[in-house]
């Protein structure tokens, strides 16, 4: 649904259909794959966390859960900061080297701060799944999708393509904040056990 609303909303902002699809394609088809490519390491790593957290949770090893959570989140934070800085600094070279188009660099620089939030959110979701909070992860993701659709529907016609970029930021920040809040709540609850 979201992918159908974006070009429609961009056209309502005054962009013609070809320009709206080109802009959307540059961000989702070119910039986002570069930003998300390093996340394959995080996804592989975080998928290994789910059974480990489940085992610790089932065995009531709550202090181990906290220690592993801190280590994993700090490592993810450091990795995502490095990736974010590299993509920001080398955005021109990456866009020319990969796509032979300099205009993609602008979107890489704009979206690079989101790397930290997106990568941490992936790890937090894996930790939550391991702590038997899969339903909470699903609820947050559904809420995030609905918020994203609302922002795209209402913001993009007013602000144009900038509204789409803003909606990406807001959506990712909301998802990260809700997931992080849920994880903190679970870790505090485990602290009392």
Regions found by a protein language model. Give the residues of each.
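Helix-loop junctions and terminal segments of transmembrane helices
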Residues: 36-59
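Membrane-interface junctions at transmembrane-helix termini in multi-pass inner-membrane proteins
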Residues: 115-140
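Short membrane-interface helical motifs at transmembrane helix boundaries
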Residues: 82-100
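Helix-terminus/linker motif at the lipid-water interface of multi-pass membrane proteins
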Residues: 1-37, 95-97
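Junctions where cytoplasmic loops transition into the N-terminal start of transmembrane alpha-helices
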Residues: 24-31, 67-80
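Alpha-helical transmembrane segments of multi-pass membrane proteins
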Residues: 100-124
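Hydrophobic/aromatic residues within transmembrane alpha-helices of membrane transport systems
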Residues: 2-6, 34, 49, 53, ...
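Membrane-interface helix-loop junctions in multi-pass transport and translocation proteins
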Residues: 132-135, 145-177, 185, 189
């Amino acid at each position: 649904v979201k992918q159908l609303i974006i070009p429609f909303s961009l056209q309502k902002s005054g962009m013609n259909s070809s320009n709206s699809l080109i802009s959307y394609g540059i961000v989702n088809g070119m910039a986002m794959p570069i930003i998300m490519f390093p996340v394959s390491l995080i996804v592989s790593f975080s998928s290994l966390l789910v059974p480990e957290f489940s085992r610790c949770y089932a065995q009531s090893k709550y202090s181990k859960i906290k220690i592993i959570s801190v280590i994993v989140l700090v490592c993810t934070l450091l990795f995502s900061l490095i990736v974010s800085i590299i993509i920001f600094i080398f955005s021109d070279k990456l866009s020319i080297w990969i796509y032979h188009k300099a205009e993609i660099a602008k979107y890489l620089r704009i979206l690079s701060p989101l790397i930290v939030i997106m990568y941490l959110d992936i790890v937090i979701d894996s930790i939550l799944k391991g702590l038997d909070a899969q339903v909470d992860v699903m609820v947050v993701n559904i809420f995030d999708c609905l918020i994203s659709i609302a922002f795209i529907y209402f913001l993009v016609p007013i602000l144009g393509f900038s509204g789409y970029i803003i909606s990406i930021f807001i959506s990712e920040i909301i998802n990260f904040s809700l997931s992080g809040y849920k994880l903190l709540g679970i870790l505090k609850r485990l602290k009392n056990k």
